[in-house]
From Swiss-Prot:
Source lineage: Bacteria, Bacillati, Bacillota, Clostridia, Eubacteriales
Name used for this protein in its record: Large ribosomal subunit protein bL20
Biological function: Binds directly to 23S ribosomal RNA and is necessary for the in vitro assembly process of the 50S ribosomal subunit. It is not involved in the protein synthesizing functions of that subunit.
Keyword rRNA-binding: yes
Family: Belongs to the bacterial ribosomal protein bL20 family.
GO terms under cellular component: ribonucleoprotein complex; ribosome
Gene3D superfamilies reported in the protein's UniProt record: 6.10.160.10, Ribosomal protein L20
Length: 117
């Protein structure tokens, strides 16, 4: 029986990696070995940053809420504690959106929280 070297499968694998590396600079988009390393590293970065994105947005929301709350005379922690005590269930994403795009409504929310504290 003759030996099969697997050229078809190898060609397909190389094409798949080079397709993923399309747009990379220099040898990273032309040379399979270098492109393979670049693609593997980019997938590691993508995996890591999908998780980091969640942390980054939470930090951004907290910063925005804190800034808006301080403009209305409360710290972030007192504001969040007052929200919890008053039974207002708004998540940080919605609060940050309100703080940026609807400052009047956010100010009314702060007044409700001040009444509870």
């Amino acid at each position: 029986m003759s030996r099969v070297k697997g050229g078809v499968r190898t060609r397909a694998r190389h094409k798949k990696i080079l397709k993923l590396a399309k747009g990379y600079f220099g040898a990273k988009s032309k040379n399979f070995r270098i492109a393979n390393q670049a693609v593997m590293k980019s997938l590691v970065y993508a995996y890591r940053d999908r998780r980091a994105r969640k942390r980054d947005f939470r930090k951004l929301w907290i910063t925005r809420i804190n800034a808006a709350a301080r403009m209305n005379g409360l710290s972030y922690s007192k504001f969040m504690n007052g929200l919890k005590k008053s039974g207002i269930a708004l998540n940080r994403k919605m609060l940050a959106e309100m703080a940026v795009n609807d400052a009047e409504a956010f100010a009314q929310l702060v007044e409700k929280v001040k009444a509870v504290i």
